[in-house]
Design a protein with these regions (language model features):
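Hydrophobic, aromatic-enriched interface-forming segments
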Residues: 22-63
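Long, contiguous amphipathic alpha-helices that act as assembly "spine/axial" helices in icosahedral shell
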Residues: 1-14, 37-52, 89, 120, ...
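Alpha-helical scaffold segments that mediate packing/assembly in large oligomeric complexes
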Residues: 1-38, 155-159
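Sequence/fold signature of self-assembling virion shell proteins
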Residues: 20, 61-159
Length: 159
């Protein structure tokens, strides 16, 4: 999906990936949000998919764990950031990367993609070892990026 993202909506390159730290990881989320703002992406429903190490950087940021607020206390208790910079943060070990480096952290909105599914070639038959009738069919599905301007990518490597 990151291949569909326009060049203007990318931070970093595969040749020169960004190396975030606990002090600036949140700022990169803000920068992704600004790119989506400039592309007229709706604010409600934004998401970002981050690898575990990037999620860990956010957990080390004082802004998320400073005590005194209910959200910070919750972050300390369960280790989940949840939301930041207008994004719902999704942690995944399946973030596209090149041999453990150059992670492509994807941010966007659900309006950027579409999903379709259909059951075709439906047939009834009689199972060999059972009494009665059964149905079988071919389930086809697929997804496609239809509004690439509503996606943004941060290409980052671990420090």
């Amino acid at each position: 999906m990151d291949a569909a993202v326009p060049g203007g909506n990318k931070i970093g390159t595969t040749g020169a990936p960004i190396v975030p730290t606990k002090d600036n990881a949140y700022e990169y989320l803000v920068d992704l949000g600004v790119l989506l703002d400039e592309s007229d992406t709706p604010i409600d429903g934004r998401f970002v998919v981050v690898p575990a190490w990037f999620h860990g950087l956010l957990l080390k940021d004082e802004r998320f764990i400073k005590t005194g607020s209910r959200r910070a206390d919750s972050t300390l208790a369960n280790g989940q950031v949840g939301e930041a910079a207008g994004f719902t943060i999704l942690k995944s070990n399946n973030v596209p990367n090149t041999t453990g480096a150059k992670y492509k952290i994807l941010a966007g909105h659900s309006i950027a993609t579409t999903y379709a599914e259909q059951i075709v070639d439906l047939q009834t038959y009689q199972p060999e070892k059972r009494f009665g009738d059964a149905v079988k069919g071919l389930h086809v599905y697929g997804a496609k990026v239809v509004r690439p301007e509503n996606l943004a990518v941060l290409i980052a490597s671990k420090s």
